[in-house]
Amino acid sequence: MQLTRIHETIRRMIFDILHTLVILQVGLTAGLLLIFSIAVNPGLARLSEEEYYRAMKFINQVILNSTFFLVFIGPVITMPLLTYMSRNDSNMFILTLLSTILYFLGVILITSFKNVPLNNRLEKLNSEEFRDVFLWYKKPWNFWHNIRTFFGLASFLILSTNLIF
């Protein structure tokens, strides 16, 4: 009996730590996406085509770092684990599963199959080939970015409601 309580206490501590980590990861990602939408993109829109090309190229280079990957890609591991650990609480399980699905479909897949290919294409250009970057890069990149921002925020809000219910 005592051993069962100890195991349950340890399981609950691990669950609470994991839940906090997931909320932090998803919240930071959603915040980054939102700030990019409401501050960075409007600022970049004021640049000339060449300035925009150079700025996005630099942003795409510096964002690829270990901290970014831990926060942005980390939920690929932590969210399914949290979902599995919440399987005995139906409300928590449903909210966590929904949040996980939204994050994977709306943030990870859109980033992987829409934004990253555009970034890779931009990276391959030299300084003379940037013409029409507004047409083939900026419009579709911002469109998909705004969609992933919505999904990131929705995932974070749903995940956070687990703290209330």
Task: Give the location of each predicted region.
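Juxtamembrane boundary at the C-terminal end of a transmembrane helix
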Residues: 160-165
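Mid-bilayer segments of alpha-helical transmembrane spans in multi-pass integral membrane proteins
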Residues: 104-113
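Interfacial segments of alpha-helical transmembrane regions
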Residues: 14-27, 91-105
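Hydrophobic residues within membrane-embedded alpha-helical segments of Major Facilitator Superfamily
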Residues: 25-28, 78, 102-103, 151, ...
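Short, Lys/Arg-enriched N-terminal segments with co-localized hydrophobic residues
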Residues: 1-12
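Interfacial loop at the N-terminal end of multi-pass membrane proteins
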Residues: 16-18, 26-73, 119-139
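Membrane-helix exit/interface motif
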Residues: 38-40, 56, 75-89, 114
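Core segments of transmembrane alpha-helices
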Residues: 71-82, 148-156
